Amino acid sequence: MKRLLAALLALMTLLTMTSCAAPDAAETDDKLTLVAFNVGKADALLLTSGDTAYLIDTGTEDSWADLSRALEALGVTHLTGVIVTHMDKDHYGGAKQLAESDIAIDGWYASWAWEKEKWKKHPVVKAAAIRGEEITLLQPGGTLSDGLLTVIGPIQEREESENDNSLVLVASGGGGKMLLTGDMEYDEENDLLAAGVIPSCEVLKVGHHGRDDATSAALVAAVQPKVAVISTSSVILPESPAKRVLRVLSSAGAQIVQTQQAEIGVRVTLSGGNVTVEFLKN
């Protein structure tokens, strides 16, 4: 209960800041770029703005070789931070190998919604420890890199679904915003919709690989995305993306792109409020 109250207090602070803040990073002319890597039915996202670069989720252990080659192909030798949205293997699986790589990493981040009695087993804690480093837990209202990233969820910890403990982030820049959802399902969606913290965003990273237990019509109506990115593999997960999810996104006018459509991944760029999409090849 104390942890829930702390998260709600942080969220109230976020709402207050949002209502009276000065112009944010979304109103600058800096480009904001998201690369959603093709790592099968898993998540690995590279968010960049200027010299700042965050890797959000690390794919699976088995997909690390592909992710490593993709990062090398893009010239990534330094990360401002590694953020793991929640504790599913298709999101943290490559963390250990990343820690053992030559890529410089300034910080490690994870969701506050984690059982403290299992702290030593936290995969990101173990990965950071390889480098003798500690992790930072992110709570609603927290920001990184002068507002480039703002944490809006999770508001509460849910024992019945680790997916609904996913960090939900708003990335601001390039004259717009991107909503990055991890594996957020309906319960966490409803929490954030009820709290009124989901902004309209040009880009939506679709939750839970486009499966039918996420991405409600209400969420899509709130976000109003121009581009929706789905990280999935229909070979591994035939029911993804779900027809309903594709239908609700299409009805909202969103361009739908999937990581399985590209060799390396999909690059989405926000600049001057305009969105461009590129399918990256080896």
Feature roles, as predicted:
Residues 8-16:
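Bacterial N-terminal signal peptides
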Residues 1-4, 8:
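Positively charged n-region of N-terminal signal peptides that target proteins for export
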Residues 3, 17-282:
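Non-globular, low-confidence helical/coil segments that flank catalytic cores
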